Amino acid sequence: QPKQFINFGNWTLFGKTLERIKNSIFDYPIVSTNKKYISEIKKHLKLKGFKKYRIILEPAKRNTAPAILSSTLIKEIPENQPLIFLTSDHLIEKTNLFNKSIKQHQKYLTDKNIFIFGIKPSNPSSEFGYFLSKRVNNKYKVSKFIEKPNLEKAKKIVKKNAYWNSGMFFLTKKSIINNFKKHQNRIFNHCLNSVNKSKFKNNIYNLNKNNFLKCKTISFDYAILEKSKDINAINLNIPWSDLGSWK
């Protein structure tokens, strides 16, 4: 069973993620997954009181770039809509600070830029990727990404005020479209065709298999973040655990 659905007494990681968006600043959740977990996801959504939601069913694993793009391209989302992408296996405390930071940064969103959430390291760790950022005009501009370093390098970059890359993103639909068209146009076309030919029923989009399978398997970090010149950071000092890295 995936970690996000394991019951820790009376809670699960996916349940905690849904609780995080039970706030008036958010609209409705869109969950990207595959057929295997659909009943578990619907059970959680019902339990947390979500009447409106969308589930995007991927016919195959293609990593986070196609998953993010295909869940964005559904027609009901307006192009200027701000979107926040959350992983389902993270544990975040002080959600009031997390939500406050989203509200504070929304005014800076454009049709090209991307905000990533950085977490102040509680200790040097080789389990996570890092980034360096510098303050430019009221926001933090990402200057460098560092792949999961060894422990010695992690100690050095933490002293340079590096933040953990949490894998959570905040941007507009238009920005996603523009970035994929510019940096990953083939993935964009295959995902668009897959969404346009999808079947929609009972809150669920079944993506078109033939088109989706043509998408390259690649993470959003490699596909877009490493190529875009307009990456900004929302740097947070809150308790955070990526239990996806828990063995």
Regions found by a protein language model. Give the residues of each.
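N-terminal nucleotide-binding beta1-loop-alpha1 segment
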Residues: 1
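A short acidic, often aromatic-flanked loop/helix-cap motif at beta-alpha or helix-coil junctions
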Residues: 61-65, 122-125, 151-152, 240-242
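Catalytic core of tubulin tyrosine ligase-like
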Residues: 130-247
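Conserved beta-strand scaffold positions in the cores of enzyme catalytic domains, especially
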Residues: 5, 55-56, 114-116, 231-233
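Residue-level signal for inorganic ion chemistry
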Residues: 5, 14, 71, 89, ...
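Short acidic, glycine/serine/threonine-rich loops at helix termini
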Residues: 43, 95-98, 126-130, 181
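Conserved donor-nucleotide/metal-binding helix-loop-beta segment in metal-dependent transferases, i.e.
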Residues: 91-125
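Conserved N-terminal catalytic core of the sugar/cofactor nucleotidyltransferase
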Residues: 7, 11-85, 91-96, 119
